[in-house]
């Protein structure tokens, strides 16, 4: 950024803000959160002269008043069910008793941790990631039409209609893109929880804009 600073200055600033960060990270939370989003931001960090990748895991909650609240930011490099169980248990220690829905995707071990810490919580597959993975290898000329057809699946009013839409989309595109819909069938049990809710609630669940826009400000 065009300027330099000393290690001593950085240490002084760190010493002053660390207690505030710890107070924030340990503050009491609400008892109930309808929805939690969990996502990772990856950074390059210098550690003893070596550059390595670390992930900051951001937990964004939607409270019972519909307001967004960052509950926690933790840094780690070892995703596992044990790690996520400790993160979720820390939320419980801060007062959280119930979470209706947790939206997270691609985080190793989190499904098992949710089942252990909050066994009644729904954990649907992230639809946005599902769609992105499907369209990843689809050329531009077909992407818009394919994406529009995929919407008929997750915009369906119930699971039965969604499954019919899935079969129709697969029949339409499988000759041209043979493996494009395989993950939808493989992940179907993890996708279907969104159909337990109204379309308006379902849209909130499968839209990750809330946490993605937040994480973009951290970058």
Feature locations, PLM:
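RNase H-like nuclease fold core
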Residues: 3-7, 12, 16-103, 108, ...
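Short, solvent-exposed positions on alpha-helices
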Residues: 8, 101, 129, 179-182
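Hydrophobic face of alpha-helices
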Residues: 11-14, 111, 147, 166, ...
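Inter-helix linker motif
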Residues: 119-136
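Generic structural signal for alpha-helix starts
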Residues: 139-140, 198
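Acidic/histidine-rich catalytic cores and adjacent linkers
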Residues: 156-219
